[in-house]
Amino acid sequence: MRTFAEKAYDLLRKVPEGRVTTYKEIARGLGTKAYRGVGQAMKRNPYAPEVPWHRVVASSGRMGGFQGKTSGSSIVKKIKMLKAEGVEISGDKIKNFEEILFRF
């Protein structure tokens, strides 16, 4: 039987380059409201970059966390990774968030 985290990773693998999703969308895709559980799974992701956890952002379109951090060099790294995939970011927010949001 697959764990909650493994199921979350399976969904995240479906998010293509240049798109993002949210903790909330992944939880919805799993049929739950365990948004924080999704966040914990992403924090512990042992399969990066195959499971592209840098593509998970907050529901507001802001960066959220990355590698267990919410500021500093980890967020700078997340922004660089997303920009390299063509995601437009201003400050710590995605410019065209609703257009590139991947829903399950």
Language model regions located:
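Nucleic acid-binding interface residues in structured DNA/RNA-binding domains
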Residues: 1-104
